[in-house]
A protein has these predicted regions:
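Short beta-strand elements
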Residues: 675-691
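Glycoside hydrolase catalytic-domain context in secreted enzymes
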Residues: 1-673, 690-691
Length: 691
């Protein structure tokens, strides 16, 4: 038996044995994302590129969950874990079938390039909805849960997760191939590297993807500083470049002068897999003396180690018998529905919700996102075998008459190319006039907030120019509101949106997945209570934001600003009335009693800490949370552990340690700011502690 087939040896030993049998040409070929077969050694071809940030993506039918920003809005890491576990189950089911048929194409492997744990620091960033929001702690908690769900706890990895994009990456999309993110040591440690360190140390993430941009002058995929951080944290997985990022070294960053030099620079820094085609020049780099054979083989060992950890060279694994029938099965769709319900955020309710079906005979469902599948999907999405749009969900749940009108194009001034501008406004006005209540479904989709290079992008390479709806939708809202009927606005978007016009209720639905229509209907009609919380700050205007290209955290996110706020981070209403009635702290644990004076509801108890020292963030920061269910009139005891790291802060030179001795802890259903208290009608409790 060849040593690389000997399952009693470690993955490292087996990988070294396998690579020792390769020629240098064969080893170099394995560093491409589309690695060819090495038939004489029995190594099948393997494509490293697969996606799965909210369900398996781009590989045909799969369960479609809410976009990642919606998963963060649940404030429920157990459910985030379950989403990832289902995603990896479906990935294995597909891999088992595809491998039998020798189909080893892109999006069919076991290395999932997820999660995206970049910090959504600026609401204009088009890819922000792929992330878990603006807070490092929440991002890390969701990210760790997702990694553990993807990788499993078996003898071999169920799938291999990949933390991306390392690091300091959050727009602007239009300049990402040439941009240099300049960031100080404090912001690096406190904000941009926090989640990556947590995923490496505590979740043992198998992969890390480098970003397109430079960080303080160094290309992220060849950064001595960033690679040094991974070594310090004990990372022993594989490192992959973002797709065609190494080409940027010589075409945009101008740190090398040729593809050969770029390939050499990336390899020597520690980039194992090139998503792109620059590593076809590695043998030329070897001939020129720019890299060594040992460096090529070392990278190949890292990659074979991951494949061995996935069980690819074992006789069998515990996942081989996962059947194809699990893909998009009813049980998985039920979890998608549960996520959609828990992710949606009720931002405003003037007493209209939940709607009483018995008092209404006709509902008008209006808007470009009312019957839109794209409004459910986000990006990096799979294909659902059944979509329930907002319109379909409301029609299924309501026995009376539903009048539908598209109202307007998502962003163009007309729906029909042959018509005059505003060609669908009259229909929307008529539907509103002939109804008892209006449900107006507006927002965005991935064509107007997304990634640079996506074929469907219409504006600003995926970024948003401002925080308002497109003009076509603003005019629609104004016209429908003039009719004077009660109006509920449902906004499908992955980021901060200022609706501007008044309404009777406002629900931010994110991109809620294939079950989004059922979820919105059940919330509107009161079958369930909304309970999502904002994982990002909603701002009034983009005009008052710092410069998009400025990566300093001052005046950004809830930790550093209280200006220009429309709806605060952590805010979200329910149909209940959950209040904290007592608070105590002992031995690293916070104990609270909560009471619900309203309807049965889920809610989130949020814990914030303020360190009393000069280098602490300006405002209290999230350091714990727990999702609860409380019946009407019920009291509940809740315990939240305060992590040791919560008592540390970061100095101006990037040193993290406990500087303060005195702290204030705040507990409530939102953060302890005046606006959250005003909007929710409840206060937080606080306690002073020493440590």
């Amino acid at each position: 038996m060849k040593n690389y087939l000997n399952e009693s040896l470690s993955a490292q030993e087996r990988a070294e044995a396998l690579v020792n049998e390769m020629t240098v040409e064969e080893a170099a070929s394995q560093l491409r994302y589309d690695a060819p077969a090495v038939e004489r050694l029995g190594i099948p071809a393997y494509n490293w590129w697969n996606e799965g940030i909210h369900g398996l993506a781009r590989s045909g039918v799969a369960t479609m969950f809410p976009q990642a920003i919606g998963l963060a809005a649940m404030f429920d890491t157990d459910l985030v874990f379950k989403v990832a576990d289902i995603t990896s189950t479906e990935a294995r089911a597909k891999y088992n079938e595809y491998s039998k048929r020798d189909d080893r194409d892109i999006y069919k492997g076991l290395t999932l390039w997820a999660p995206n744990i970049n910090i959504f620091r600026d609401p204009r960033w088009g890819r922000g909805h792929e992330t878990y929001g603006e807070d490092p702690y929440l991002t890390a908690e969701c990210g760790k849960a997702y990694v553990k769900g993807l990788q499993g706890s078996g003898k071999v990895l169920k799938t291999a997760a990949c933390a991306k994009h390392f690091a300091v990456h959050s727009g602007p999309e239009a300049v990402r191939h040439e941009f240099n993110a300049e960031v100080n040591w404090k912001d690096l440690e406190e904000t941009y590297l926090y989640a990556f360190e947590e995923l490496v140390k505590k979740a043992k993430v198998e992969g890390v993807m480098g970003a397109y941009n430079r960080v303080n002058g160094e290309p992220s995929c060849a950064s001595e500083f960033l690679m040094g951080k991974l070594d310090k944290w004990g990372f022993d997985g594989y490192f992959v470049s973002d797709c065609w990022a190494i080409r940027d070294f010589h075409e945009h960053h101008m740190v090398t002068s040729s593809p050969v030099e770029s390939a050499a620079m990336a390899l020597k820094a520690g980039c194992n897999v090139n998503c792109g085609c620059t590593y076809v020049h590695l043998l030329s780099a070897l001939d020129k003396g720019l890299v060594t054979e040992d460096e090529i083989r070392a990278s190949c060992v890292a990659l074979m180690r991951t494949r061995i950890r996935l069980g690819m060279f074992d006789k069998s694994t515990e996942y081989d018998n996962i059947p194809y029938s699990v893909v998009s099965c009813p049980e998985h769709k039920a979890v998608s529905y549960q996520c959609a319900v828990k992710s949606m955020v009720l931002l405003k309710n003037k007493g209209i919700l939940p709607l009483d079906k018995k008092s209404i005979s006709t509902i008008a469902v209006i808007g470009p996102n009312a019957d839109s599948r794209a409004a459910l999907e986000g990006n990096y999405n799979g294909t659902a075998d059944r979509y329930v749009t907002f319109l379909e969900g409301i029609e299924d749940a309501f026995e009376g008459r539903v009048l539908y009108a598209e109202g307007c194009h998502l962003y163009k001034d007309r729906v029909s190319g042959l018509a005059q501008a505003g060609d669908r406004y009259a229909e929307a006005e008529a539907a509103a006039a002939n109804s008892d209540v209006v449900i107006l479904c507006v927002g965005l989709d991935a064509t107007i907030e997304g990634e640079e290079g996506d074929t469907g992008n219409e504006f600003s390479s995926g970024d948003k120019n401002d925080l308002r709806l497109p003009e076509s939708q603003r005019e629609l809202i104004k016209r429908v509101a003039k009719i004077g009927k009660p109006m509920i606005v449902v906004c499908a978007a992955g980021s901060s949106i200022n609706i501007e016009h008044d309404c009777d209720a406002l629900i931010h639905a994110w991109y809620p997945g294939s079950e989004g229509g059922k979820a919105i209907a059940d919330i509107i009609f009161g079958k369930v209570s909304p309970s999502g919380k904002l994982p990002v700050t909603f701002y009034n205007s983009a005009d008052k934001l710092p410069c998009f290209t400025d990566y300093a955290m001052s005046d950004r996110t809830y930790r550093y600003t209280r200006d220009n706020i429309l709806y605060p981070f952590g805010y979200g209403l329910t149909y209940g009335d959950v209040v904290v009635t007592s608070l105590s702290y002992d031995d690293g644990k916070v104990n609270v009693e909560v009471e619900n004076n309203g309807a049965d509801t889920c809610d989130v108890i949020e814990l914030y800490i303020k360190s009393h020292c000069d280098n602490a963030p300006v405002y209290p920061v999230l350091c714990g949370f727990k999702r609860i269910f409380v019946k009407k009139g019920e009291k509940l005891d809740v315990e939240i552990e305060v992590p040791d790291k919560a008592f540390t802060t970061v100095s101006d030179i990037g040193e993290r340690k406990q500087f303060a001795k005195e702290f204030t802890l705040y507990v409530g259903t939102h953060q302890p700011d005046e606006l959250s208290c005003q909007l929710s009608g409840t206060n937080c409790m606080s306690i002073e502690i020493e440590r």
